[in-house]
Structure formats: C-alpha cells, structure tokens
Amino acid sequence: MDWRDQGILLTVRRHGESSALIEVFTEDHGLHAGLVRGGASRKMAPHLQPGAQLDLTWSARLEDHLGTYKAEPLRSRAGMALSGRLALAGLNAVCALLAFALPDRAPYPALYHRSSALLDLLDSEDLWPLAYLRWELSLLEDLGYGLDLSACAATGVTQDLRYVSPKTGRAVSGAAAGEWADRLLPLPPVMRGEGAAEDIEILTALRTTGFFLESKLAPALGNRPIPEARGRFLDALARRV
C-alpha cells in the first residue's frame, strides 16, 4: 500500500551506510516514521534537516510496517533557523515537542497547519515568542490537556484573573485565590491574549504551560522527560530579557 502527503521533518537518524530513518508530522497521517533510501547521501542529506517541508510518498507491503519514503524537498527552513540563536532553539523545541508528544499515525490537521505556520515565522524574532506560546497552548488543547482561562473556576468572574489551578488548569481570580495564591501558577495577561506580550511575561507563561506538559502530558506518555530542547529555547528567550 502507499500514500502521498506533505509533512514537516521532525527527526532524522542515519541508518546503515546511506539510508536515513525519519519521523515526519504529516497533514493527513500524523506522526509517521519511515526509511529514506539514500537519505544520508551527499545529494539527499542537505534536504533532510529538521523543520524541512517535504512532499512524501510512503510505501509498504502492509500498513503496520515501517515502510519507505520517497521525499522531495518543498521548503527548507535551515536558513531561517540559522538567523539567530533564538530561531534555532525555537525550531529544535517545536520539532522535539511534536516528536515527543504526538501519538503514532494519528492525524491532527489543525495542529499540523499551526505548526507549519509557526515555523514559517522563524526569522521574525519579534513575533516568534508570542506565536510559540500560542502554539504550545494549542498543543496542550489538541492533546486533551487544554487550559480554561475564560473565567474564574471558583466564582465565574472574568476580571482580575491572576492564577491557574495546577490541578484543573482553570483560571482563578486574585480575590478567590486568597491564602492559596502561593500554591497556584501565574496567569500573565498574555496567556489570555491581553497586554503587551513582553518577553518576561511570555517566559512566565511558558513556565506555566511547561508545568502542564510535565505534570499532565508526560505521565500519559510513560513519564518520559520533556525534551531538553524546550528548556534551551526558554534559556535563549531569557537572554533577551
């Protein structure tokens, strides 16, 4: 059997003398691995870089086999990734998180398009941090761990929302938090699409989303550690503050 699709290259590993084992996030087939014969050759290897947009034809005798890919480059993002430390760290974080979090062969077309659009902003460093935060929030949402920041979980008010409950992922107002405030996670305005989206606020927001990646998503995936590439991206962003 075979199919054709577009995909974002997430990981690539040499296999044997000249082949490459790749993982791609495709529009219609989700996270899908396969072997590219000649993928480690001088001709093909430069096109098989993480973040690359590929036209893919997958073939296998049976659906549950690893299968092989024919991969044609559509768009390289290597140049954008090399435009600065933040861009490279961001690309690595996105690819690593997708490879970590996505179930095999389950389509997430909306997340695929958001991921592709995010990577196309790699060389726009002023836009990238906020776009990344929105993407990470959508990643949690699509995988079943979305945050409800619309109103206070305790009172229903929509004003003065300052915290997120680590148990429920719901917003909590300053008044409702009371003496429990130090046990809650910060909810900077940028997480609700408000405020000036300064880097320091985005960093705070990413520490909150990171809590849910570690405490909710990771346990569902066998308690594997969150990819270090995400931490390196936060470090690169912190250097700008």
Curated annotation (Swiss-Prot):
User: Family per UniProt?
Assistant: Belongs to the RecO family.
Q: What is this protein called?
A: DNA repair protein RecO
Source organism (scientific name): Ruegeria sp. (strain TM1040) (Silicibacter sp.)
> What are the entry keywords?
DNA damage, DNA recombination, DNA repair
Source lineage: Bacteria, Pseudomonadati, Pseudomonadota, Alphaproteobacteria, Rhodobacterales
Q: Which Pfam families match?
A: RecO_C, RecO_N
Q: Which InterPro entries match?
A: ARFGAP/RecO, DNA_rep/recomb_RecO_N, NA-bd_OB-fold, RecO, RecO_C
State the SUPFAM superfamilies in the record: ArfGap/RecO-like zinc finger (SSF57863), Nucleic acid-binding proteins (SSF50249)
* One annotated GO biological process: double-strand break repair
Biological role = Involved in DNA repair and RecF pathway recombination.
Annotated GO CC locations: bacterial nucleoid
